[in-house]
Amino acid sequence: MGRRAQRIWEGAGPASGLSRRNRQGCRYEVYIPDYLHGQEFTFDSSTAADVSDAERAIRDLEVKTSTLEDTEALARLLLRTESVASSKIEGLVVGARRLLRADAARASGEDGGDVTAAEVLGNIEAMTYALQTVQAGSPITVPVLLETHRRLLGGTALGDDHGGRIRDRQNWIGGSSYNPCAAVFVPPPPDIVEDLLVDLCAFCNEDSLPPVAQAAIAHAQFENIHPFADGNGRVGRALIHMVFRSRGLTQHVSPPVSLVLATHVQDYLAGLRGTAYDGPPGSKKA
């Protein structure tokens, strides 16, 4: 739930060297999501059943894993698989051998020169940090999200300027790289992003909802806030696992959430955009 607000993009002058189309000004709409902390949520019977089934499957996976002799090896494999799949959703595709070479180069202090592999390794490091930091009963905080993002972008071209920092300018999805005039989605303006993140973390630390439902809502809210210059999708999917850990749904394993989403990318992205709803709160669509 949320509302849309009109904004004006001033555009750039002829001295910018941009084409007329890219330097144009326009009116555009930003989406401002409602705060989540303290909100009440209701689910229809079908959704409630799906949530229950998903939680049962995750708990079964956790129980089966705990009976194995080497749970740490499986946990590392699942975390790595989840990180690679989450990266794939963003178009970052790296084969196993290529990733191993980049990992070995990083371990020896060398610059492997493989930009894509470095981004995937950054995602593995970010996920590892997030799930080592957030344990059952521990809070999810803005500093944890920022450090997760810093580790994600570490070793990339954007790391120094943007890693671990809330964006200070307007961003958008789709359209031109120079203005939001034809954007598919424009998240909230930068001056309210930090407050929205504080509220989101407060929601993540509630215990009134089933963990799977809470994680799904938190993920959608994070993506609608789009708090970073880059890496929002990967940190947002890591947040799903943070909620699972914090609520005690998982302790050792990382369920293959991104692996499933990666096989239904268009449906997943359409579903996320559908959560940016600004209609009547009592309607069926809401």
Locations of regions flagged by a protein language model:
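FIC/Doc superfamily catalytic core
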Residues: 1-286
